[in-house]
Structure formats: C-alpha cells, structure tokens
C-alpha cells in the first residue's frame, strides 16, 4: 500500500510539474523599446543567447548609433572569449548581429513578439502612453516588462489590459557584464508570467532575484539611502568625502566609495529616484532630499558625465 501511495504521489507531482511547465511561455522573440545604454545592452545579451531581437527607437540615427555600440561591445567580448580562435570570434559577432534588427515603428513589430522590454526615460506618463498603444497591437500571449529602476510597476501596468502579463525586469548597467536581474511581481502578475521571465533571465546567463513592487526594489532600496546617508554625514561636517570614500573601500570592501559611485551613476539620476520616493512617502526619513546634491544638480554638476559632481574630472 505504501508503495502504491508513493507511486501515486510521484505521478501527481510529475503531472503537476509538467502541467505548470507547459503553461509557461518560451520566450524566443524579444522587442526592446529604447536604444540607449540599457536598451542596447538588453538587446545585445538577448541576441547573443539565441533570441530573435528587434530594437526600437524614434529615429534611424539613434538606432544606427545603438547598433554600432552593440557591435563594438560584441567584438570586445568575442576577443576575450575566443582568444585563440579569431575565426570563432568573428562568427560569434556575425551570428549575434544577424539575430538583431531595428525599427522605428514599435506597433508594427510587437504583433509577433513574445516579450516587450521597455527601457525608455523614467517618465510615468510616457511609459503609460507607450504601453497603452502597444497593448492594442501585441499578441494575446505577449508579456510586457519595464526596466524602470524607480517607478512602481503597478502604475505602469495599469495603463494596459494585461496586468497579469506585466512585470518588472530591472537589469543593471553595463548589461552584458552585470549578472543580476530583479524580476518584479505586482499583485496582478500571474505565476505563469513570473516563471516565464525567470526562465528567460536564466537563458540570458543572468541570475534572477524576485521582489515585490516596492519602491527601489532590492538594490536601489538599500543602495540609495546608503548614498544619501553618506552625503548627510559630509553635510554635518563629520567627515570629508575623501575619507568617507576611503573608509568604505578599505573598511567595508566596497569597490567604490559612495561619492565616487554617486558621480559615476549621475547625481541627477539619484535625485530623480529620491524625489520620486519622497513624493510617495514624504514622512520617511530615508527619503528626505539632500541640499548639497540638489545644489549640484541645479548647477548642472551631475558627476563624471559633466566633468564635475562631488569631485572634478579632467
């Protein structure tokens, strides 16, 4: 009897697993909206792992620049990957680029795609308008995902009729190098959608982690308050920014100090994230604005990209 029971349980478990697996969407065709650093990086890793990819942006000039950047990045990667075999390196680059096409008309390409990943500017109105439009043209099974790092996924998903097929896919820059992807599940995201996206991330060679639709998700929710607290420590005159950076590198083992990292990321980017959180929860002490950062942003001293932030760069 025990043997029969065990066999029955195994059979039911196996059938249940097979049924769940059958429900998941195998993502083969990917449409990436936004040809900036993040969008181009996502398109690159998807194409390099055997997916058919369409990269979409507003103009052919932007797309040409994006594709050139992808090609250069692929050549660098191939040179390291195939150090003893230049022919294999060339074939890798050629094969990847053959899987990647571009378009300026998102509506015309989403009808046959399995996944749409949005990586445009951090503006809720623009994201809502984009997804609302694409929702009318995309296939029934198509999953929508946003790469936002600061906006709530639920607020973006609500612009569509497919909240159950909507989630967050937060990649990290530079996408080809960074292994982590945060998969954000809203209260409406179906388990089928979530599992399909987790599997997709794994096919990219990434390590997916799951998080609810909370401000900042995991990494930014921990990282941004740390960066702002470093600024406050400096604002109070407790320590110089140089000593704070040195302490965190030598004492905590961080590769960059908080002020170095702020300048690298861009002060405008950090301010945008913090302002959004402060608007959502104005009483939270972790989300209070930073006067010195606001002052630097007002002066257009945004970090390395402008030549000056908390530090000056040649």
From Swiss-Prot:
It comes from Rattus norvegicus. It catalyses: a (3S)-3-hydroxyacyl-CoA + NAD(+) = a 3-oxoacyl-CoA + NADH + H(+); (3S)-3-hydroxybutanoyl-CoA + NAD(+) = acetoacetyl-CoA + NADH + H(+); (3S)-hydroxydecanoyl-CoA + NAD(+) = 3-oxodecanoyl-CoA + NADH + H(+); (3S)-hydroxyhexadecanoyl-CoA + NAD(+) = 3-oxohexadecanoyl-CoA + NADH + H(+). CoA binds at residues 73, 80, 149. Residues 1-12 form a transit peptide. The modification N6-succinyllysine is found at residues 80-81, 87, 136, 185, 192, 202, 206, 212, 241, 312. This is Hydroxyacyl-coenzyme A dehydrogenase, mitochondrial. The gene is Hadh. The modification N6-acetyllysine is found at residues 75, 81, 87, 125, 136, 179, 185, 192, 202, 212, 241, 312. Belongs to the 3-hydroxyacyl-CoA dehydrogenase family. Its EC number is 1.1.1.35. The record marks 170 as: Important for catalytic activity.
